[in-house]
Amino acid sequence: MNMDIFDNDLSIPVNLIRQWCFCPRIVYYQELLAIKPNKPLWVAQGEEFHKKVEQLEKRRSFSRYGLENAIRHFNLSIKSQKYKLHGIVDWVIETDTNVYVVEYKTNPNPNSLGHKLQIAAYALLVQEYFAKPCKTTFLTSDKKSYEIKITDELINKLIKTISDILSTLDSGNKPDSSASDHQCIQCEYYNFCNDR
């Protein structure tokens, strides 16, 4: 997706937030230079994992999440002009009074800032879409779930990150990278960084 940075309705895909946390240059290469590398093997594995988990979740109760009566919404596409975000939420659990985001990961890391900010972004989207609070989310694999609370501190970090991404897209300047050598080796844009 190439973004028109002069578009007043510009919104960024939520998955860019996690990418930005991994390395801001990914956003630069992907969105401003429109470089589309081949998908690494783990991306295809993740897509298969999502399909498998969705089929399993359709048959499960809500007890894993401490809920009883609820409605499931899978792969919900949402856009918010207010937050300048859009994305496809893996799964939303809707009760009479609240909504809960469930984000699938093959290797969920509840301590990863990228994972936390991504799920917080989805929480903002579903909260606006359903007009119900979303203060609790779940980062889950096929075996384990981690509860992530949506705090004011997390939302403030998210808003700053969105602002930083939009500023980079607006300026067109290649951002600095704080990625470690270990992160760089995993990156599909590694060959494009001439200072790494």
From Swiss-Prot:
One of its GO terms (molecular function) is metal ion binding. Its cofactor is Mg(2+); [4Fe-4S] cluster. It catalyses: exonucleolytic cleavage in the 5'- to 3'-direction to yield nucleoside 3'-phosphates. Induction: In culture expression is high during early log phase (1 hour), decreases and then rises again in late stationary phase (16 hours). During infection of mouse bone marrow-derived macrophages (BMDM) expression is maximal after 2 hours, when the bacteria is expected to be in the phagosome. Its EC number is 3.1.12.1. Mn(2+) binds at residues 50, 90, 103. Keywords: Antiviral defense, Exonuclease, Hydrolase, Iron, Iron-sulfur, Manganese, Metal-binding, Nuclease. Disruption phenotype: No effect on expression of bacterial lipoprotein FTN_1103. Bacteria are as virulent in mice as wild-type bacteria. Belongs to the CRISPR-associated exonuclease Cas4 family. This is CRISPR-associated exonuclease Cas4. It comes from Francisella tularensis subsp. novicida (strain U112). The gene is cas4.
